[in-house]
Design a protein with these regions (language model features):
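Membrane-water interface at loop-to-transmembrane-helix junctions
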Residues: 732-753, 770-777
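Long hydrophobic segments that form regular secondary structure
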Residues: 762-770
């Protein structure tokens, strides 16, 4: 492969190309119009029944108005029913649209992926969407191709074209002798959306956006919220259970009301039809109230809120299930570099095996040509690395030595390359050097040293001693070696280095400090019952020292808690299962070691989250319950992951666990509140049906209760901010039912207490004279009991006061809407809601009297906190 100097496009040429060929953005497919989506809400079977009942109610009201000459007030209730239906469906629709917009962010992020291009003779990074036709693009292992292009250079370039052709491995070349005449696309073409599995290259963009092959078959990558997560499945089962219960109650109400009619009324067809219609409407309304249609909305809102806020804490959720699963995580398998450390590589020391100038020049050239990274030196005082951080650190070291790495690259010509891989743990490059070919090798010192002429025992001891010193300081090390090749000598065969008589040049020690926030984040995870395991390519000594610095490795730990990748691979499956829970560190790990570790932990019932940033991490990311890719990781790793940690930091992973646990807790709070109201509403209406008096709650009143219980409660409780208190709990059992024992006891006791109070009040009012005023009192008492209970639901499992609402602006806003809404309905609802205005003194009695719900809850929480 020849070495080329590319100029690339100028700024003016970029603008001209974009105007001529368009931007590198795919046009989204046409969406369903909002009005159609809104109308779909009215095709719900229960809403249809309610609409039919409402229409029949209007018919009867017309008969009463036109034939019986009753006043226009007969229309208030049916009109109220329709307003309540519109309000409930409308609010649900608005929040569904809002949630969709929250999720749409994931589809935009892909257009912001950084791409390395050459423009104005300078290598720079630009967002994928800014790539234009004619751009010179550099591609490397793990990259996703930004636009269709013609290869100008290619080194061991293997592409995954499965997204277009189904071919997982497709060899690419610029050598016409290697062209495949039967290939679906030309061998020297790379295509948008395909991924570099191995090697690197340079291409010139031929087509962007919709003009690419990918664009021609594009369907917008929408979030698939039809996929049922374990939480969704649990909620579906719960919803069906409640629905069946509510149907049974509704059936009993119809039976009871019909019996009461024949026992207490003279038969009259018009009266009977009106009575039956009212009965059916009450029964259907009770079903509407009882059926938890707010559950899906609570989950959607909670996910949308969590995903948006998690993005602010550097967690980009790519797949829905990941939010809830992070909350159940029991083990986190993490990389070291960039996740536990700052990924700010700098050369701390260079140990030369030979101290002459020729040796130094060989090392300089080795570093310069054996690298795919480049430096952006537009700011001479602070060069910016484009590419691999480790290789960048070496180039910056050359820069500080006043050595221009580009001079070595232009003076030599690369003849052959063997790219770095985690399996071989080294890379090799053959270049022309004067009249000779020189092989330069860079990689793990012990692996490179094995291929060197090392007859000198003292040299071996010196190497081991120096490596130990560096490892005890948690430095990562690289070894450098070379060989001048004879004219006919072959050193790379079938992707393997076949030379073992190299000359060792030096060890370079690179420091990468631990992130300041990581020790505390690791402690939080350990306190939360989550095991942390480091899986790294570094030596055992380096990994152990990093483990000590972050608080994972303690003085009591021994060799049972650490293992090398080779030793781990040699264990039988049974031995792995016996030892895997004790392991804290796997050093010199390879990608398949990480995958095997994850599978072994899963076989023991653990919920595993795993980090990865490279292409070879994809298998482990896919098999884990939650795959966590790094923000600067490869596109292949991100594609396989569920969450992208934008800042790469372990502390962000800890925050993702907190969000996952809080999300689950918020949904539990919503269920707790809703089922408590369900129990009270069903028992009160059922009791009223068999008393032969007026029904305690009218249809419009129950629809207002439904609006509070479903829509408003979902908005208030599903979007509560996360609490660090959840990190003091142990991980929940992922298979456990969402209603735990404490919740069930709370629902039964509180719901039962409310029912007793409301039935006693109803019995008293019914026998004392059930007037419109008494109905208004009763309706307000019912709502205010639920109002105060919402505060208790918010405080559920926090151990804190329900009045501690700092930071809960959404909750307070909804509480205000419910309170003001109840006052307005009672004051101005009139015959539409079957209410009349209440005296101020009665408002004071009701508000203070029903608040006992809150004070009893506060007392119980106070006692529990003191225990």
């Amino acid at each position: 492969m020849k070495h080329h100097n590319y100029t690339g496009l100028s700024d003016a040429e970029v603008l001209e190309s974009r105007q001529k060929y368009g931007a590198n953005i795919l046009t989204e497919p046409e969406r369903i119009p909002l009005w159609k989506r809104f109308l779909e809400k009215f095709f719900d079977p229960l809403i249809v029944i309610l609409l039919v009942a409402g229409i029949l109610s209007i018919g009867i009201s017309c008969y009463e108005f036109l034939v019986l000459h009753e006043g226009s007030t007969v229309f208030f209730e049916p009109v109220g029913i329709f307003i309540a239906i519109l309000l409930a469906t409308g609010i649900a629709f608005l929040f569904e649209v809002k949630a969709d917009r929250e999720f749409a962010i994931l589809n935009q992020v892909n257009d912001e992926e950084p791409v390395m291009v050459i423009r104005d003779s300078r290598t720079q990074q630009i967002p994928k969407c800014e790539v234009v036709v004619g751009d010179i693009v550099l591609v490397a292992t793990g990259d996703e191709i930004a636009a269709d292009g013609l290869l100008l250079e290619a080194v061991s370039l293997n592409m995954d074209e499965s997204t277009l052709t189904g071919e997982p491995v497709c060899y690419k070349s610029v050598d016409k002798k290697e062209f495949d005449a039967d290939a679906t696309y030309p061998t020297n073409h790379v295509l948008r959306g395909t991924k570099v599995m191995e090697g690197h290259g340079i291409c010139q963009v031929l087509a962007v956006g919709d003009a690419t092959e990918n664009g021609k078959v594009y369907k917008a990558a929408q979030i698939d919220d039809t996929v049922k997560t374990p939480l969704n499945e649990q909620l579906d089962r719960l919803g069906k259970l409640i629905t069946q219960f509510s149907y049974a109650i509704a059936f009993l109400i119809i039976i009871g009301r019909v019996l009461m009619f024949f026992l207490h009324h003279d038969f009259d067809w018009i009266h009977f039809i009106s009575y039956i219609l009212q009965t059916v409407m009450i029964a259907v309304t009770l079903i509407v109230v009882a059926v938890p249609e707010g559950l899906p909305m609570a989950v959607t809102l909670s996910l949308a809120y969590s995903m948006r806020r998690m993005l602010k804490t550097n967690n980009l959720v790519r797949k829905l299930h990941a939010c809830e699963t992070m909350g159940a995580t029991t083990v986190i398998c993490t990389d070291k570099t960039g996740t536990l450390t700052q990924n700010q590589m700098q050369v701390s020391d260079v140990f030369f095996f030979q101290e002459d100038e020729s040796c130094r020049q060989l090392i300089y050239e080795n570093i310069a040509v054996n690298s795919t990274a480049v430096l952006d030196v537009s700011d001479q005082t602070k060069p910016h690395v484009l590419g691999n951080p480790t290789e960048g650190a070496l180039l910056i070291w050359l820069h500080t030595q006043h050595i221009d790495y580009d001079t070595f690259r232009t003076q030599t010509m690369v003849v052959e390359e063997l790219p770095f891989s985690t399996e071989r743990k080294m890379m090799a490059t053959v270049v022309t050097h004067g009249d000779n070919h020189v092989l330069y090798v860079k990689g793990a010192p012990e692996i490179v040293f094995e291929r060197c002429v090392n007859d000198d025992l003292q040299a071996t001891e010196t190497l081991q001693h120096q490596l130990t010193i560096y490892q005890e300081q948690a430095m990562r090390t690289l070894g450098f070696a070379y060989k001048v090749l004879s004219p006919e000598e072959v050193c790379i065969v079938d992707g393997q280095l076949v030379v073992d008589d190299l000359t060792f040049l030096s060890i370079v020690a690179i420091s990468d400090p631990v992130r300041p926030d990581v020790p505390l984040a690791v402690k939080e995870c350990l306190d939360a019952g989550i095991k942390v395991k480091i899986v790294t390519g570094d030596t055992p000594g380096t990994a152990r020292e990093i483990g000590r610095q972050i608080g994972l490795w303690t003085e009591s730990d021994d060799e049972r808690h650490i293992i090398t990748g080779a030793a781990f691979a040699a264990l039988s499956d049974e031995e792995v299962r016996e030892r895997v829970m004790d392991l804290k560190i796997i050093a010199r790990a390879r990608p398949m070691d990480k995958k095997r570790l994850v599978e072994a932990l899963q076989s023991l019932g653990q919920v595993v989250a795993v980090t990865g940033d490279g292409t070879n991490d994809a298998p482990a990311l896919k098999v884990a319950h939650v795959g966590l890719s790094m923000g600067d990781g490869t596109s292949v790793a991100k594609e396989a992951s569920d969450i992208t940690i934008i800042d790469n930091s372990f502390s962000s992973i800890g925050r993702a666990v907190m969000w996952g646990r809080s999300l689950y807790r918020n949904i539990q709070r919503f269920i707790l509140f809703q089922l408590t109201v369900n129990v009270a509403a069903c028992l009160v209406v059922l009791f009223g049906a068999f008393m032969g008096t007026e029904i305690p709650l009218t249809v419009t009143q129950m629809l207002w209760v439904n609006l509070i219980m479903d829509t408003f409660a979902a908005m208030a409780l599903a979007s509560l901010p996360p609490s660090s208190a959840v990190m003091r709990d142990k991980p929940r059992d992922r298979r456990a039912f969402i209603i735990n024992r404490q919740m069930a006891w709370n629902i039964i006791t509180v719901g039962g207490l409310f029912s007793l109070i409301l039935i006693a009040l109803f019995y008293y009012y019914a026998h004392a004279g059930w007037s419109l005023y008494e109905q208004s009192l009763y309706f307000t008492i019912f709502v205010m009991l639920q109002f105060w209970n919402m505060f208790n639901a918010r405080a559920f499992a926090t151990g804190e006061s329900a009045l501690k609402v700092k930071g809960c602006r959404g909750f307070l806003f909804i509480v205000e809407i419910i309170f003001i809404g109840q006052i307005l309905i009672v004051s101005f609802g009139g015959e539409m809601f079957n209410v009349t205005s209440l005296q101020l003194v009665h408002w004071i009695y009701i508000i203070s009297g029903t608040s006992f719900v809150l004070w009893i809850g506060e007392g119980i929480r106070w006692v529990k906190k003191r225990q």
